[in-house]
Amino acid sequence: MDQEIFIIGLNHRTADVEVREKFALTGCTSLEPAVIPLGNGISEVIILSTCNRVEIMVAGRGDDVPDTVLSLWANARGQHPEELRPYVYIHRGLAAVEHLFTVASSLDSMVLGEPQILGQLKDAYRDAVARNTTRVILNRMMHKAFSVAKRVRTETAVASSAVSISYAAVELAKRIFGEMNEYKAMLIGAGEMAELAATHLLNCGVNKIYVANRTFERGLELAKQFDGEAILFEELFTRLPEVDIVISSTGAQQAVIRAKDIRDVLKRRKNRPMFFIDIAVPRDIDPDVNNLDNVYLYDIDDLKEVVEENLSHRREEAAKAKAIVRSETEVFGRWLRSLDLQPTIVDMYSRSTEIAQEELLKTLRRIGPVDESTQKALEAMLNAVVKKIHHEPICFLKRRYEEEDSGQRYIDFARRMFNLDNEPEQPEAHKNRKRPQPDLPAGCPGKTIL
């Protein structure tokens, strides 16, 4: 194959956040024509740029492609290539394909199994297609990457369990209550953790979200994001009987909720169960609350145990996912190698079609004019014959080429056998001379040729 796949990139493992910011390409959404132009050995390009990685996927010719990309990338950010080089990795050929499949399956993410990377890859591909910078190779590779990612999520549990504190908190609530659409939740505090928890609660279908925050305006802002209701912090215990799930993350120096407060709340709730999740440090909720009947209290240490247990489970599932990635990389590699066959297959069909057309014209001259429908029927018949004659030889070529390292020998033999390169015929004097046996590839029919 005259073209090769390269991936040139950096990520959260090879570069800290300052370096990633310096060389990010998010400002030019995948690429503008001036950043990584086609040409100079580059025939296809896609750029993925996120907060945790920049990866430039290229199909091109020549050993200098990575250096060309590196220079263009650095120049686009107003930096010298040597400033970028220490942080960059380069994958080539099937190693590049396997790397992409690994990334798409979220096996290379900072949080193993997180789903965002697949969407980011799809956005990068969509942008490249819109800019007309992809062709057969990268198009096929990206679609295969999406298929591999789907297979990994379907056949493994690599993304099935909570690995963030906020997500784990909501997952615990779901275990207690089951379906969440009949239950109401209250967030005490309106910081980042509360915002993440609200997102997960909403995704789980919780009936309503209340937000209690010392700064009412901030609570109101968060509540509006999730179609919830902000309440004054002073009204906290007045409104608590209405809710079933409480997630607290105020960062206060003393407990915000004490056991005696919850006893009164439970009486007003007629002892219906309540679920408290304290993700604040120092803790917002007095641990004695957990001694009350029909109350479930978890603090951040409990959640960390859940997260670590789930991460361990994800790591086990990642081993299965990597086996899928390796298998699919081999499949893609066979397709990639089969591209070498395409010119020969096209030439075989072209030569046979040309001969068929010549013979059709001879026949028509001999039998005289025919009507248009008859001529179309004859042409369709000849095309069908050409396809059927070539079906078995082409299947044979593909099988041998995929299965054996010496695939080029089969291409060479097919080209000689069908004289696709228009080599001159043997002179008349040599026609009756016994020919030496050609060095046919193993498995070819007709080992003896007179």
From Swiss-Prot:
Known catalytic reactions: (S)-4-amino-5-oxopentanoate + tRNA(Glu) + NADP(+) = L-glutamyl-tRNA(Glu) + NADPH + H(+)
EC class (word): oxidoreductase
Region listing for Disordered, in residue ranges: 422-450
Site (Important for activity): H99
Residue sites binding NADP(+) per the record: G189, A190, G191, E192, M193, A194
Positions that bind substrate: T50, C51, N52, R53, S109, E114, P115, Q116, Q120
Chain ranges passing through the membrane: none
InterPro entries recorded: 4pyrrol_synth_GluRdtase (IPR000343), 4pyrrol_synth_GluRdtase_dimer (IPR015896), 4pyrrol_synth_GluRdtase_N (IPR015895), GluRdtase_CS (IPR018214), GluRdtase_dimer_dom_sf (IPR036453), GluRdtase_N_sf (IPR036343), NAD(P)-bd_dom_sf (IPR036291), Shikm_DH/Glu-tRNA_Rdtase (IPR006151)
PANTHER family per the UniProt record, alphabetical: GLUTAMYL-TRNA REDUCTASE
Assigned protein family: Belongs to the glutamyl-tRNA reductase family.
Annotated NCBIfam families: hemA (TIGR01035)
Protein name: Glutamyl-tRNA reductase
Organism, as annotated: Oleidesulfovibrio alaskensis (strain ATCC BAA-1058 / DSM 17464 / G20) (Desulfovibrio alaskensis)
